[in-house]
């Protein structure tokens, strides 16, 4: 397994095991298979586990699989979707969420604690779901005035090694956070050949994921690439029911030419998509959404094969799938 430096967190594996598939939030999976996949990931050289309370059973499975005794060098992340509560509640909610996550995983600290909310500037109106934005998005005043100092306190207390933001919010707000006087230590940024956040995108402005990753790298942050297969849109088939107008389903249809290209090469599209993401500039580690050992083995083999050939990257880019 190749490694990279994840900002101030130091050396990590190029692949991170994400918690969504392990936690049983998409596709079919059993508890036994999830536990076996966790162990197989570390055996395969993965050194980062990316968890969150929103990933259903993920944190509990990590606790059960390792009993609080992770192998040396393995790093764990977790998250909290804060939204925009009253300012006086921000620190308490972050602390309570972290405490619950640590108890579930049987750990005393995590290496990285993410704000799992979208981020928006004060007064911003989302194109989709604006009436409910306080549930899924943190406004700038709360972020700057409450989240940043609360994260600093948790870091000073030793309960977290570092903190970060999930860079799926409004790009203007995310980029401001990356340039703020007190910056996060890491960001999770969209990293796929379509530059698409899919159903995560609730705003109308361009997503600008490569710009976000570049800004983070330039400012010394670690960058974790997420949605390498765009929620299944870049695989041979989506593993869960989706409505016809779901953006992930729309992306799957748009990616028909990509699957045809992979068929010409005799390659699995999911493996090609992961190898493309691994070759993207400014991405330190790619977070996998696998849910079983077979999918994990494919990704491990893809990482071992290395990046795509320049001609392959050019052929993919020539399909014109990347969002503007």
Question: Where do the language-model regions lie?
Answer:
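Conserved, mostly hydrophobic/aromatic
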Residues: 17, 34, 49, 62, ...
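N-terminal binding-site loop/beta-alpha segment at the start of enzyme catalytic domains
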Residues: 1-75, 95, 108, 192
